[in-house]
């Protein structure tokens, strides 16, 4: 099945209120610093939004489903982002979210690699 970048982005954009993105070093003493909700980035850390209307996000998947921010040409930051589903949604919707994210990331990564050659 062909997943278009626009369709995947639209699905995730519609479901954005059900998702929260947590940094691995969230410190409760600093309030919500290190937490990104919905389409937002991580305040004070220079990490851009993961999901935007056009699907742009500087993140890639690891084998265990975490998201690791990366910037081409620079050293990878040692920070991991994980997706937490805030509201109760079906397993099917969770799978759709995962597939959409994976597709967007792989397409963007391929595009960046081609541009850098």
UniProtKB/Swiss-Prot annotation:
It is found in: Plastid, Chloroplast. Its main location: plastid. It comes from the Eukaryota. Similar ORFs of opposite polarity to the rRNA genes have also been found in higher plants in the ribosomal upstream region. GO terms for cellular component: chloroplast. This is Uncharacterized 12.7 kDa protein in 16S rRNA region. Keywords: Chloroplast, Plastid. The keyword Plastid applies. It comes from Chlamydomonas reinhardtii (Chlamydomonas smithii).
């Amino acid at each position: 099945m062909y997943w278009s970048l626009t369709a995947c982005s639209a699905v995730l954009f519609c479901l954005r209120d059900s998702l929260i993105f947590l940094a691995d070093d969230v410190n409760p003493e600093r309030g919500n610093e290190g937490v990104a909700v919905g389409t937002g980035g991580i305040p004070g850390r220079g990490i851009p939004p993961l999901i935007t209307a056009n699907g742009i996000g500087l993140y890639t998947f690891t084998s265990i489903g975490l998201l690791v921010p990366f910037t081409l040409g620079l050293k990878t930051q040692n920070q991991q982002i994980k997706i937490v589903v805030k509201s109760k949604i079906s397993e099917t919707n969770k799978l759709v979210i995962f597939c959409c994210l994976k597709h967007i990331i792989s397409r963007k990564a391929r595009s960046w690699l081609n541009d850098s050659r």
